[in-house]
Amino acid sequence: MLKQVIVVEGKSDIQRIAQAVEADCIATEGFTLRKGVIDMIRVAYEKRGIIILTDPDTAGERIRRVLTKKFPNAQHAFVPRDEAFANDDIGIEQASPESIRRALSTLHVESLESSNEFSMVDLVRHGLSGMPDSATRRAIIGAKLGIGYGNGKQFLYRLNHYGITRDAFEEAVNS
């Protein structure tokens, strides 16, 4: 049983999590984030810690940003987009139990201060920005680093705020 409570978007996500790991979960039930849901998440955050595991889509990223502002020491897990897509739908409920376990094995806490280790020059140098296949390359490298997919700006932010080291980055890019 995981100590932390996993925060997901919906009840189908909770059912899929149960197939992967033994953990308590809270569903946000969309991005309106009702007060009662926020209160439940706050109690879990203060008593046990939370892991934010939202869908790898625009709505999921929006929910993640809102939750991160409210709960700055939350841990983050990311299922890669290509591992969360089935039946013309994207979401945690589409991910395999193995993909979920892999995501939960690579947790990150967002730092309020940027490491400034990486710049756009690094992204361009490694074909992660400014190239026709940059989005695909970011998805692959994001999956290897456990930081998920993001556009160039989001990806750079995650590199600098999720404790990614230069060595880990270089290893992911070169493998």
What are the residue ranges of the model-derived segments?
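Phosphate-handling DNA/RNA-contact segment within nucleic-acid enzymes
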Residues: 1-3, 15, 37-40
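Short active-site oxyanion
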Residues: 1-5, 48-51
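Short, flexible loop segments at the rims of nucleotide/cofactor-binding pockets, characterized by
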Residues: 2-3, 27-32
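Short glycine/serine/threonine-biased micro-segments
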Residues: 8, 28, 58
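Short, polar loop motifs at secondary-structure junctions
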Residues: 10-13
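TOPRIM fold recognition
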Residues: 19, 23, 31-175
